[in-house]
Amino acid sequence: MPGFLPEFTGKKNLQLLGMLQEGVTEEDIEEAMNAVGLDPKDRRHYKKYSLGMKERLGIAQAILKKPKLILLDEPTNGIDSDGIQMLEELLRRLKEAGSTIVVTSHDRDFLDAVTSQCYEMKEGSLR
């Protein structure tokens, strides 16, 4: 999970990250938060977020600038079944929009739902 400032809201954290990247607008931030099921108007500090909300904010950060390559490590960690379905749909849309998505996960059902190619790490070898 990326390092976010615990005393800031999710949106404020993304705004700070957006200042480090050229061309990130308020609309981009709100769109990314909405895409992962977070309310940009939520005034809770990051430290009050559940594990699933923290994971969603990390995914929002990853998609903020609509990158061509998205790397996600265990993105379903702490996310409930409704959130996983939302994430599956989001990843399908990003793939259709031209992004390449690399996911590491122990959740085989999730991988089957979102990947076109799947490799398994076993005894230090990729298969």
Predicted regions and their residues:
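Helix N-cap at the start of a conserved alpha-helix in ABC-type nucleotide-binding domains
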Residues: 81-82
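H-loop/switch region of ABC-family ATPase nucleotide-binding domains
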Residues: 105-106
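Conserved catalytic motifs of ABC-family nucleotide-binding domains
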Residues: 66
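Catalytic Walker B motif of ABC-type/P-loop ATPase nucleotide-binding domains
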Residues: 70-73
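Conserved ABC ATPase "signature" region
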Residues: 15, 24-41
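Hydrophobic anchor residue at the start of the ABC signature
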Residues: 59
